[in-house]
């Protein structure tokens, strides 16, 4: 089965070097952040649209994956085994990688087999929600365009299909 692990980030996390200092000031910094980490993943995957990947067991131990395990990656066109967690040079900011490393054992306690050593981490997915939020008032109407009711993921108010549906219902009401 496939699953995603989401690490929340805020505008103060948008610096491209992965540091958290609150220096983000441009509304498009979120887009720049996405592009930076997607480009890094492209490079780590070898530049041919293969995704960077690593076995969960190796990721937790801080070891490099050299061969696939019993769980084969489902991503097409394929996965290149690499070190997703090189300090300062990994596929995500160090704090995000640390959060994933901490969360995996907790997931395992709730879902047996979730973090089995041969499971494959494939990354990155940077688009769980819009990096921009279209501002809206208490009535859910856009503050800038009368008659526009921004809702869901594309408007920056949801991070998945369920929360987008809930937001859409709230806006419609």
Task: Give the predicted meaning of each segment.
Residues 152-173:
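A conserved FAD-binding loop/helix module that cradles the flavin
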Residues 5, 44, 134-136, 150, ...:
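Generic low-polarity alpha-helical segments
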Residues 83-152, 165:
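A glycine-rich dinucleotide-binding beta-alpha-beta segment and adjacent secondary-structure elements
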Residues 13-17, 143-145, 158-161:
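Short helix/loop capping segments that flank catalytic or ligand/cofactor-binding pockets
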Residues 1-86:
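An anion/pyrophosphate-binding glycine-rich loop and adjacent beta-alpha core
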Residues 52, 56, 130, 139, ...:
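Glycine-rich, flexible loop/turn motifs
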């Amino acid at each position: 089965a496939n699953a995603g692990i989401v690490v929340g980030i805020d505008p103060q996390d948008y610096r491209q070097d992965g540091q958290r200092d609150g220096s983000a000031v441009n509304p498009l910094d979120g887009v720049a952040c996405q592009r930076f980490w997607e480009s890094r993943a492209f490079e780590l995957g070898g530049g041919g649209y293969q995704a960077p990947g690593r076995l969960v067991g190796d990721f937790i131990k801080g070891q490099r994956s050299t061969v696939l395990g019993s769980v084969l990656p489902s991503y097409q066109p394929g996965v290149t085994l690499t070190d997703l967690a090189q300090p300062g040079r990994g596929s995500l900011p160090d704090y995000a990688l640390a959060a994933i490393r901490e969360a995996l054992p907790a997931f395992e306690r709730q879902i047996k087999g979730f973090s089995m050593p041969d499971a494959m981490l494939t990354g990155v997915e940077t688009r769980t929600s819009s990096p921009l939020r279209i501002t809206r008032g208490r009535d859910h109407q856009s503050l800038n365009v009368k008659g526009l009711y921004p809702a869901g993921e594309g408007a920056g108010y949801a991070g998945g299909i369920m929360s987008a549906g809930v937001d859409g219902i709230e806006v419609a009401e």
